[in-house]
Curated annotation (Swiss-Prot):
Native species: Rickettsia conorii (strain ATCC VR-613 / Malish 7)
Protein name: Uncharacterized protein RC0091
Length: 179
């Protein structure tokens, strides 16, 4: 039954049957076993999580894939746990790299005036904080702020000029006092 369920993971194209199958397998693993079988079942359970992760990653379901790696890491030996945690990091890094490339190309082509579609995707995939950082890096000033910028810059230059005039007056007074 376990082998049939694992095969089902690999041929399913929809996430609903995958999640249902995953639930059934978890219930099977939770059935009490004798001590000799526990180690064997834990190894099989870990392999199942890893297989499921690889399949979910191919379907581009990154958060679910990373979650399966984390579950595998939780029952792995300390050495295996480190390797699995590195894979989790790689999965998320790949996702963020792809997001960055996508956002940059859309902005460069002028095909994205606002980033609402990226924000919706960030909400859906729970990458809001990381994606928001990317959005903040790429979004230019809104048009109104962009128009006001030269005026603000000019005011700052005028202040600089007034401050420079004060410095010049002080130097002149010092020169007269010294002379």
């Amino acid at each position: 039954m376990l082998l049939e369920a694992i095969k089902y993971f690999k041929v399913s194209l929809s996430i609903d049957p995958i999640e249902e199958c995953s639930f059934i397998l978890r219930e099977i693993f939770n059935i009490p076993k004798n001590k000799k079988e526990v180690e064997k079942y834990l190894s099989l359970k870990k392999d199942l999580y890893i297989s499921l992760e690889e399949f979910l990653f191919k379907l581009n379901l990154i958060p679910l894939a990373a979650f399966e790696y984390l579950k595998a890491a939780s029952i792995a030996s300390p050495q295996e746990e480190q390797k699995l945690l590195l894979k989790v990091h790689k999965v998320y890094s790949t996702e963020m790299e792809e997001n960055t490339v996508f956002i940059r190309s859309m902005l460069d082509k002028g095909k994205m005036e606002d980033l609402s579609i990226v924000t919706k995707e960030a909400d859906r995939t729970k990458f809001l904080s990381d994606t928001q950082t990317i959005i903040n890096d790429f979004v230019s000033l809104p048009e109104l702020q962009a128009k006001e910028w030269p005026e603000v810059q000019q005011n700052q230059n005028e202040q600089l000029t007034n401050n420079q005039q004060e410095v010049n007056k002080c130097q002149l007074i010092q020169d007269i006092g010294i002379g």
